[in-house]
């Protein structure tokens, strides 16, 4: 236990695990971001990084939680989409996020839920880093109703 008088934050994400026949469940783990390396995103001029808490190729996991960081001036320079819905919780800083047809100002403490195939982009104007938790379902087919 900590003897510090500083306030801390804890994010607990709960979901029902989606089993797949023939794939064993991953073991539970707790990890601090200091244990993960920053992976620079391609063609970002060292302004856009992602910390991955699990190996992206490990299909036992049915969700990922990453930390995305933009340095001032960092951008997602194109409207991208994803096949899965995903959540974003802003940890630090301010930016404008392109969601579908709108640019929305976001800052620390904000939460975004993005639908599948929602066009998105980001511009982090500064003055400091812009960081967020990125949650997304992975490695499972979307069920048809």
Can you describe what each PLM-predicted range is?
Residues 45, 58-62, 82, 106, ...:
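A generic fold-level signal
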Residues 66-68, 88, 133:
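Conserved hydrophobic/aromatic positions in well-ordered beta-strands
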Residues 61-66, 86, 93, 128:
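A generic structural signal for short beta-strands and their flanking turns/coil linkers
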Residues 47-54, 66-82, 103, 116:
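Conserved short histidine dyad/triad with adjacent acidic residue
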Residues 75, 81-108, 118:
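A short beta-strand-loop-beta hairpin characteristic of the jelly-roll/cupin
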Residues 1-10, 116-142:
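Ligand-binding loop in jelly-roll beta-barrel domains
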Residues 1-62, 145:
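A short, N-terminal "cap"/entry segment at the start of jelly-roll beta-barrel domains
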């Amino acid at each position: 236990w900590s003897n510090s008088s500083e306030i801390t934050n804890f994010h607990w994400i709960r979901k029902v695990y989606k089993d797949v026949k023939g794939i064993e469940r991953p073991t539970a783990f707790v990890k601090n971001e200091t244990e993960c390396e920053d992976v620079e995103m391609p063609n970002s001029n060292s302004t856009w990084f992602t910390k991955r808490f699990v190996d992206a190729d490990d299909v036992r996991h049915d969700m990922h939680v990453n930390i995305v960081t933009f340095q001032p001036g960092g951008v997602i320079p194109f409207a991208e989409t994803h096949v899965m819905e995903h959540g974003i919780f802003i940890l630090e800083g301010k930016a404008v996020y392109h969601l579908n047809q709108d640019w929305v100002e976001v800052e620390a403490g904000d939460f975004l839920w993005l639908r599948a195939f929602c066009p998105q982009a980001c511009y982090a104007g500064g003055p400091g880093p812009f960081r967020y938790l990125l949650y997304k379902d992975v490695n499972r087919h979307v069920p048809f109703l």
